[in-house]
Each structure stands twice: as C-alpha cells, then as structure tokens.
A protein has these predicted regions:
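Structured-RNA-binding interfaces characteristic of tRNA pseudouridine synthases
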Residues: 1-277, 288
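Short, intrinsically disordered C-terminal tails of secreted or membrane-associated proteins
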Residues: 293, 297-310
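Intrinsically disordered, low-complexity segments enriched in serine/threonine/proline/glycine
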Residues: 277-284, 290-291, 302-303
C-alpha cells in the first residue's frame, strides 16, 4: 500500500460539513463512497483530513491522505472522479507521499480567509452566497491592530465551542484584513494558525468586526481573550463567508517529527508572556438586514443560512 495526498476544493453550501454523518451529505462521505468505486476496490478507503470544516464552509486548499494500492493510475482516478462527483466538489491533484505524511498532524498551519461586505461595499449578487454581510463600516486599521493583539500562543477558549477533552490552546500566526480593489469593495480577513478549535475562525472574525465597526472596544476584546471559557458576547459569523485556502507542511524529512509534536496535548504550562508578545500579563446581535441576503425563514436559497447562529 502507498500513502496518497489528495488536494480538494469544494463549495460547502450544500454539504453538512466535512465529516461523515448518518443521512447527511458530507464531503468525506462523497469521497469515501466514490474513490473505491472508481478504483474498483472491495475495501473502504478512509480519509484523514487537515481541517474538518463545518456545514456551509468552503475550501480551495483542503488536504487529505488515504492509503491505496501501489499501482493507482492517478490520471485515470482524477478523470473518473470528475465524472461521478457533483460540480461542487473537485479533487484537484493526487500524488504519492511518504508513509510518515499525515494530513492532519503533519500540518504546520492552516490558512482561512473570511470574506465580508460592510456598508461601504457594493454587494455582488453573483457571489452573495460566499460573502457575509456585517453591520456598519469597518475600520481596517482598527481591525488589524485588534488582530495583532491576539497573535501568539494562548488559550482561545473564549472563541471556541467546548468539546470534552479537547484543548483550546493554539498559536495564532497571522490575523489581518484588507479591502480588495474590486468593484464590490470586499473585505478579506486572513487568519492563519497551527490549528483551530471548533468555530474559532468565525468567532474571531465576529469579535474583530465588532471592534472595527465601533460596537466594541479594544478593552472588551482584551477581556474576552483573557477568558478561559466560551464568551457569549462573541458573535459566531455565518459559515458562508469562510474558505479554507491553504495548508502548510514541512519538508519530507520533518514529517514524522511534526506529527509527533502535533499529537502532544498542550496545556497552560506551555503559555508564557513572551509567547503572547507582551511583557505584562493580559488582564482579565444580529447582523443588519442585507438587501441580498434577507429572506423569510425557510425560503433562503442557501440551505444552511438559517442554521447559523446569528446572535
């Protein structure tokens, strides 16, 4: 058997997330159904993925690995998958990797982009189901200052949905926003970390946009970030604006070491003031109705729109 890396892109609108669920359409479910069929295998082909995206979240740079027979014809595999998979999911490449490669644990970082329209934007009806509205005008200098204050190794419990036994300690490597030079004036918030907790990116963006729109202060964000439990005041942004863009990996020689490091559960003992980028310890609504996204409950064409927690 050989380990193969799959690079995958999908529009998450009509998927109940990545992970297989009974009686739900998921990305993992579709791929694990069709891969053995197109390869004419009589055994299952379980996939391990870099990021288990939630319902409605998109991906351009998702990565998974799977163990398959040595003689797989990758060109034929890609061609057959393109015929049987629906247009909202594409396997963009398949290539052999060392047996030490683990799509989840070997990853150095994941990069997500959240796309927004504020009141300074001109919404585009063609892309409206991949961009989320936010109330007010966003001061991007303020947003970037707030994002910088969160960088480093820390407990992101305030921004994560609790999962029993899971750590919420992460290293945030990059968090910045820019307004695109496009007709819409779309705002892109880039968030990159070694790993993410459940709903962490959408919660971070919700908190940052609250500060950037003037509805919350930097002191509020500092107090939220210092909390060791979920903050109810933080808005979880809709899934439709979020896309997994890229996953970074080390060289082949460092794959095993990185996987072992990632499997080690981190604790608060790993967190120090210097990691947080400061010499001093940190002391402890609903969106506006958007003309293109306003539909009576149950009539919105985006299947997951009304499932999002909006406040």
């Amino acid at each position: 058997m050989t380990r193969w890396r799959l690079d995958i892109a999908y529009d998450g609108a009509n998927f109940s997330g990545w992970a297989t669920q009974p009686d739900r359409r998921t990305v993992q479910g579709e791929l694990e159904t069709w891969i053995p069929r197109v390869l004419r295998l009589d055994q299952p082909t379980p996939l391990t993925v870099a990021g288990r995206t939630d319902a409605g979240v998109h991906a351009r740079g998702q990565v998974a690995h799977v163990d398959l027979p040595d003689n797989v014809d990758t060109s034929a595999m890609l061609r057959r998958l393109s015929r049987v998979l629906t247009p909202d999911i594409v396997v963009t490449s398949v290539r052999p990797v060392p047996s030490t490669f683990d799509a989840r644990f070997s990853a150095l970082w994941r990069r997500y982009v959240y796309r927004l329209w504020d009141e300074s934007s001109r919404p585009d009806p063609v892309t409206r189901f991949h961009v989320a509205p936010v109330r007010g005008h966003l001061d991007l200098d303020c947003l970037n200052t707030a994002g910088t204050s969160l960088l480093g190794l820390r407990d992101f419990a305030a921004f994560c949905k609790h999962r029993e036994g899971a750590t919420t300690i992460r290293t945030l490597l990059d968090c910045h926003a820019e307004r695109l030079d496009d007709p819409c004036g779309t705002v892109e918030v880039t968030v990159r970390a070694d790993a993410f907790c459940h709903s962490m990116v959408r919660s971070l963006v919700g908190a940052l946009t609250a500060v950037a729109s003037g509805r919350r202060s930097q002191d509020w964000l500092d107090n939220v970030a210092a909390s060791t439990s979920r903050a109810s005041s933080v808005l979880v942004m809709p899934a439709c604006g979020l896309t997994l863009e890229e996953v970074g990996y080390p060289s082949d020689e460092d794959l095993a070491r990185r996987a072992a490091q990632a499997r080690s559960r981190r604790s608060h003992n790993d967190i120090c003031d210097t990691c947080w980028g400061t010499d001093e310890p940190i002391q402890p609504r609903r969106p506006f109705p958007h003309p293109l996204l306003h539909h009576p409950r149950g009539t919105h064409p985006h299947p997951h729109y009304h499932r999002q927690r909006l406040g």
